[in-house]
Amino acid sequence: MKHSVHFGAGNIGRGFIGEILFKNGFHIDFVDVNNQIIHALNEKGKYEIEIAQKGQSRIEVTNVAGINSKEHPEQVIEAIQKTDIITTAIGPNILPFIAELLAKGIEARRVAGNTQVLDVMACENMIGGSQFLYQEVKKYLSPEGLTFADNYIGFPNAAVDRIVPAQSHEDSLFVVVEPFNEWVVETKRLKNPDLRLKDVHYEEDLEPFIERKLFSVNSGHATSAYIGAHYGAKTILEALQNPNIKSRIESVLAEIRSLLIAKWNFDKKELENYHKVIIERFENPFIVDEVSRVARTPIRKLGYNERFIRPIRELKELSLSYKNLLKTVGYAFDYRDVNDEESIRLGELLAKQSVKDVVIQVTGLDDQELIEQIVEYI
């Protein structure tokens, strides 16, 4: 049986990446620091996924195990030494924390003389996630390890898309996911092009597809959350049931379309249909997606290369409209949740400093005109 190592045994790891790896005939070693999840994986060796649609079908994922990377790093290194593929779904901010362990696993492959080519795919909501991870891993590699990695270890970027809401069940491994999923991998950085996963798309140039996803799904989802929170909605479905909010989301997506068409020459009709499907996904009555989950970490989401500021910057450069995106940024700066550290910190920054200084600090912008435009909406 083929072997995989997946970092992140959370809902997305189990409910999306785990399903695809299982359907492709892999044994999956889930690596995490959540002892409850790891123990359950080892005790049961399987878990169930429910598809949130009429009929609510279930998929049983088997041939799984768990490794606690904090308690047993040596087991992770051993797993990396023999594995056929490595994936992650841990969040962009956590990638640097697994870099040293990955590097040790790569060094172990080198010492063992394992020259089987291996690809490491960061399945995260970020542009260039796998290459970002590679830059972190390189810090811990010996010169020999670096040469070995360059020859035998690939870090192809990936774009992933599936809504997996926050949830709690008596069975800690059970997870509910939406029917839709999309996983796209760039081929130009693959070290093992012969290993093609079914239900995964492969593209020579990933950038148009990852931007289409991030600027459409992530920007649209976050827009739903921040505007929804402003109007008191508790779930994304509740937000979309408000015609005013839905209209604003559609206006944001129209601006995103203008950018994607101008930049990547996407077909207008196909992109309109893609955005129509996104709205339908947000309106799935079988998904309870809390606004608080989608809106969390606003400081990160207001970053220079993130889902709002990057498309705004690029639209401005192209002299295209971005007024609705600006309004959403204003709502994001105003968002507060006592359970979200970043939203509280954002409020503290705005209380202590001028709005302009906070905008510069959070967004990383130096375009004075754009900074002033954002300030107007806060």
Curated annotation (Swiss-Prot):
Domain of life of the source: Bacteria
Binding-site residues, NAD(+): S4, V5, H6, F7, G8, A9, G10, N11, I12, G13, R14, G15
Entry keywords, A to Z: NAD, Oxidoreductase
Keyword NAD part of the UniProt annotation: yes
Family, similarity comment: Belongs to the mannitol dehydrogenase family.
PANTHER family the UniProt entry points to: ALTRONATE OXIDOREDUCTASE-RELATED, MANNITOL-1-PHOSPHATE 5-DEHYDROGENASE
NCBIfam families to which the protein is assigned, alphabetical: PRK02318.1-3, PRK02318.2-5
The name this protein goes by in its record: Mannitol-1-phosphate 5-dehydrogenase
UniProt organism field: Streptococcus pneumoniae (strain CGSP14)
Lineage of source species: Bacteria, Bacillati, Bacillota, Bacilli, Lactobacillales
Gene label: mtlD
